[in-house]
Amino acid sequence: MEVSNKRFKREIKVGAAYYPEILRNDAVIDDDLSKMKELGIKVVRMGEFAWSTIEKREGEYDLSFFRHVMDKLYEAEIDVIFCTPSPTPPKWLIDKYSETLAVKENGERKQFGARNDYCKSSPAYREKVGMISHKIARELSNHPALIAWQVNNEISPREKCFCSYCKKGFSNFLKEKYGDIGALNAAWGTNRWSLNYRDFDDVIPPKSDVWNHPSLSLEWERFHSKNNAEFINEEIKAIKEYSNLPVGTDMMPILDQNYYQTNEHTDVVMFNHYEQNSFLMYPSFWYDYLRPIKDTPFWVTETQVNWNGAHYPEFGYRTENNCYINTWLAVAKGAEVNIYWHWREHFAGQELYHGAVLSSSGRFCYNAYEIKKAVDDFHKCRKLLSNTRVKSDIAMHFSTTAYRSFNVVQPFKGLNYLELLYDRYHKAFRHYNIDLIDTQRDLTDYKTVISPFLSCVDENGLKERMIEFVKNGGTWIVGPMSDILKDNATKYTNAPYGFLEEFAGIYTKIQIPMDTDIIKAEWKDGIELSVEKSFDGYVLTGAESLAEYTSSYLKGLAVITQKKVGKGKVIVIGSVINGEDVVRLVGEKPILKASENVELVQREDYIIALEIENKQGNIDLQGTYRDILTERSYSGHITLEAFSVMVLKKE
């Protein structure tokens, strides 16, 4: 068919991952497209594992099948996100270039047969990935069904390669960072166990059966994340030689792979998530992190329709409207695309019993109608959802460096950085718009920045920017366990903190990194303050006390302090406190008063209310509001049914 380029348009799209190359049957494809239209599916992503379909033999490329499918999709008014197939090189490539397979820490090469088991440092692998990416972009870039590209799939440094390319790359990475080996030895304190290195080639990648130096483990993780990001950027560069459509790479909810670094050259942040049936606050946490990375809306490129399962169905039965609310939550929080994995269950191979929109025999899953329900809602709210953004003047730091550091050193037993931020602090702000940001994020948009467990403040120029932020009128709520480590997971030697004592007007007299119920505290007004897990007690050297310890060795010492600096103020927290107490320190009013199972999102003068725990919730309305979805008006104390949504505008 004759085709012409179609420009990408900003609008809410619901879609599915599609693998037509598995069956290669026109009758099945036609039935698929008919059912997609029935549900309101407007976009598919495909091609990510199809290398052997596109290049059966080296240098012999054939995209005719995918052009044929894309022609059908275009006729059905369904858009395409086409993916590079780099996660699954074919057998001929492995046979000829065996060095493309990653090496396990025991020295064995991985075996052909899975995905993402390939070395991102391998010159042959990078060359072949670049070649097929070029070919795909050159041949498909002008197809009218195409709206965007995805490169690779769920890249992660968790499965590390120990080949000679990666070892040399690691040595070069360390040399670039530290300059000379003496500086590395000094920074890591290698005299500790006679670990002194003579040159960078001496620095051996850490194996899991060794009690490794924390700085070594952290930098090895950092190297693989950087190497992966460079690999992704090469794919993006290949695509952009032939196309100006948006390019992204789909990532998982892990901080091992640095999101900001990986998305430096992408046009859109892409995100895959699968969670327990009752755990919708967890993706909400990640949406608040994804949204500030770029100025453009993020895309959910994979999420479950019903059950998950790499090996068997799991993650819990999806009760009525779970799929509906999961879809709505992403869009309410700022997603522009929500794609289910996947359209049709596989009839063979890995992930055989992972849920999908259709069964392998082509029948709708039991909750497929919820997709259409969400699509119909989005149509009613299309102007609101396409023309407004989620904006916040409150930010909370969620740091890749802190995540990595607390994985290799533990200031107190059982410190789970992600769990503490998610469960302890972020959850308390479910009735506020809040951004989660890494340390390189600009602070201009915010009035208040919260930095719990921000182990390293002295990176990406953050220390200097936080000082200016406060002086210019911002409120910085920092701690506990913040500014306690350098970026290589080593301590400061002149004070417990890097610069916080001097800046915040405090002196740390006592530190107890051990949980106990003996230590108590209270606010200055006498109300009890819950403290736990670790305890820093402060003497005031310019700050004022907001809360003090009332027992044990810490009695009379401050646990929360405040100091005015310029037009703003810095508040330091010396123990793990409840999220509600952090909200008290912020001092802002919520969007509305609502029960804890209700998530609220404000977008200009609209409020989206979502019940996310599958039980009845409630909201207190000040005035009369109209629900855009039902066209009904409400006021006062109202009920929100389980897994339901209201889009409210004040009358």
Residue ranges and their predicted role:
Residues 200-203, 274-651:
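Carbohydrate-binding surfaces of carbohydrate-active enzymes
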Residues 16, 36, 44, 73, ...:
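Conserved, mostly hydrophobic/aromatic
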Residues 1-43, 56, 71-72, 79, ...:
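N-terminal carbohydrate-binding accessory modules
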Residues 106-268, 282-283:
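Polysaccharide-binding and catalytic clefts of secreted carbohydrate-active enzymes
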Residues 14-24, 49-64, 111-130, 155-159, ...:
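The substrate-binding groove and active-site-proximal loops of carbohydrate-active enzymes
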Residues 30-38, 45-108, 234-242:
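Aromatic-lined substrate-binding rim segments of carbohydrate-active enzymes
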Residues 10-14, 40-42, 74-80, 142-147, ...:
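Short, well-ordered coil/turn segments that N-cap beta-strands
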Residues 23-38, 131-135, 251-262, 319-327:
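Short, acidic/polar
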